[in-house]
Amino acid sequence: MSFALGQRWISDTESDLGLGTVVAVDDRTVSLLFAASEENRLYAKHDAPVTRVMFNKGDTIESHEGWSLDVEDVIEEGGLLTYIGTRVDTDEANVVLRETLLSHQIRFNKPQDKLFAGQIDRMDRFALRFRALQNQYEQHKSPMRGLCGMRAGLIPHQLFIAHEVGRRYAPRVLLADEVGLGKTIEAGMIIHQQVLSGRAERVLIVVPETLQHQWLVEMMRRFNLHFSIFDEERCVEAYADSENPFDTAQFVLCSLDFIRKSKRRFEQVVEADWDLLVVDEAHHLEWNQTKPSREYQVIEAIAEETPGVLLLTATPEQLGHESHFARLRLLDPDRFYDYDAFVEEERQYQPVADAVTALMSGEKLSNDAKNRITELLSEQDVEPLFRIIESSAAEDEQAQARQELVDNLMDRHGTGRVLFRNTRAAIKGFPQRNLNLMPMPLPSQYATSMRVATMMGGRMTDEARAMKMLYPEEIFQEFEGDSATWWQFDPRVNWLLELLKENRNEKVLIIASRASTALQLEQALREREGIRGTVFHEGMSIIERDKAAAYFAQEEGGAQVLICSEIGSEGRNFQFANQLVMFDLPFNPDLLEQRIGRLDRIGQKRDIEIHVPYLQGTSQELLARWFDEGLNAFGETCPTGRAVYDKFADAIIAILATGKSDGLESLIEESATLNKALKSQLEQGRDRLLEVHSNGGDKAKEIAEQIAATDGDTNLVNFALNLFDTIGLNQDDKGENAIVVTPAENMLVSSYPGLPYEGCTITFDRETALSREDMNLISWEHPMIQGGIDLVLTEGVGATAVSLLKNKALPAGTLLLELVYVVDAQAPKQSGIARFLPKTPIRIMMDGKGNDLSAQVEFESFNRQLSPVNRHMASKLVNSVQKEIHGLIDKAEISMEERLESVRTDAEKEMKAALNSELERLQALKAVNPNIRDEELTQIGNSNERTIWLYW
């Protein structure tokens, strides 16, 4: 090492000091001043851990005055370097810049500059960086991107709808699955895909106020999408940042009532630029041809300004054909412009549905059925398929011919592209519901307090009185005080204790209407029998609820009982339990179905036991009988329940308000008759073609199988743990597929993306994550992985490395140079270019003669043969072969250009094939089905042209 005053060096061990200047040299030591950090360092001259900073022709360097110079020549004189070139800011030529006057805060951005400046990283970090690039590329190319990372079971019909809709440009669809089939999850998967692909950057979700928390939790816990709830208070706070408060967040969640009640907020929502609008409970948007409701007009105004719209409703169109048309009108007002025309068009589609029913039955096709199919499809297309169906061909061949006819008929279906509806009748695998009604005597304490409350009721409305009489424990506490221990004499509590003792090995979910009841029940179970239980109510934070749910889910040492309030249980499902206790009853059938739906969902493997204790001679008994005998709402899902309730609401409320059974028998009889008629109407009106289209058939199963095959990916596990090690996160293996990850003091960064300050528990196993709500399911799409990859690539981790290869077949001193180039097409995310040309790593390995060995030498096997070198020694080795490395980099550039051309060509072919195929299919469909939107065709055509232009 030769030192001279004024030379510039960089520390190998403390690169954050900046660029140092030699200020003193003697026989044994050298002293450097690091002006940027105002530090001095004294080193032993013969082995100083520093590297000389030398720039070359073509580099751009910065002076201490702030201007930059494009280097055209380098002169060395007296051990000091002088750079000559052109100033970037003034274009002045032949400008001289001595190395002593270089910027003290110089940064090395190119990997080769870092290498020559001694900023050399470890080999394991270089390997991590390459794997990060490789995995990022593979994930962007995956056709399942956006579907693999959700914390949800792999339900085929949900995955099919999400896959079908999520890839569209600005999807505008109606999701109308029956209760319990997962519309919220379908919407979340679509949102997730749209966000990951860049098609949607700003999303607005509008829901009823009572469902805000449910949506917030579902989006965060299942999809790692962090929405902000906007109310008046949040809007006022946001004024400091923007005139329009809705511009201050990318993902916004608010209630329909909030927007409807304030003209100002409504106008601000409409003015904000949204990419995707999601509306839950869309059947509440009332409409008729003369006077649409205010709620409908609000959503209509937002939908007109928003490219993508998802409407969610569980109400079948047969129960309100006009409102069904109104929802479709929100999606495409040009297509659905006239109700009478729509009714006539729907009537014309009936033969299509009849033909599909005939095909799917597997029975011999009648002449009528064949004639109907021939009217809808061309004769030359169907005749060969008819011959196969009627021949003695193998069953598989016949089934394939029937399926091909069904597929062709689907393309002509009126609303098949904008409407998806799955029914329990069409999707198998749901458990039985077993009802256990438990009548109990009314305690005298309750009888007295209820009698007094009735006398003191004054001008209370019938509805308020009916609601009050359902909860006698609350009436008792009104007179005796909040501390009154009603649970000491309530027979429902004694019965519950016996039930829990008889079923000690079962998890039991208890739901009560009020949070106060839930809390006092937990106290009663704990104090009277020492039963392990936990509560779940709206007064708890999301983290507290997660912990309670996790405690309940825990198999060993967990809670036997989870006691929920009505609101607190929204959006939470506990399929691992099959025992449901309704300590009291909700006021309407929708809430009753919501309660049972906590357990009765796809994924439930056992029959559900529904226990309903009630006090005889009270409103509880009357309501239980009406739900059971009038609706059969306990025994099966009741899509007609709300319609029946609305019809008889006045009579129901009047009976519940008095607590007397006068008129109950006739009410039950009339309700049962109407319920049966409505269900029959639903069954007759079932659109089997739509159901077949919505559940996806074999294609849906293939999607589920593809995703299942990626679960438990050992490559992901190894990469994630290696990533966490490199960043410096603490990892504590807790067993049961669980690892606790927490921030450490000496991390590479101050905070890690996606990791809370207090840390979190992670798992790579989907089933574990589904049963443990306190765990994060780690996938390639999780923020901790995506954020970690971005961190590695942006922070320069592993940009350079030096290693030794111990191989007797190679002579000592053999130089191998491994380079990784990244093809990065700069374009807006919305362009969709990442689908065909994501960031693509090109690996080149040069031997000393300039031959590219990358095809013969695979990265991982080569990496396993390498031994680490300390940084100081690595810097010396690099300096000794710096000239050779420069030459090899020049040759590698030529090889890279050839490979780049191949990458471009392949991407262009793939893009043309995909987009042209998609465009041709949609154009052909538009000829027979007007539900293909012109905007979608235009967008695909524009994407095609724009993407070709971007490549060249």
Swiss-Prot record:
It holds the Pfam family Helicase_C. PROSITE patterns: HELICASE_ATP_BIND_1 (PS51192), HELICASE_CTER (PS51194). Keywords: Activator, ATP-binding, DNA-binding, Helicase, Hydrolase, Nucleotide-binding, Transcription, Transcription regulation. This is RNA polymerase-associated protein RapA. Residues 164-334 form the Helicase ATP-binding domain. Belongs to the SNF2/RAD54 helicase family. RapA subfamily. It comes from Aliivibrio fischeri (strain ATCC 700601 / ES114). GO terms for molecular function: ATP binding; DNA binding; helicase activity; hydrolase activity, acting on acid anhydrides.
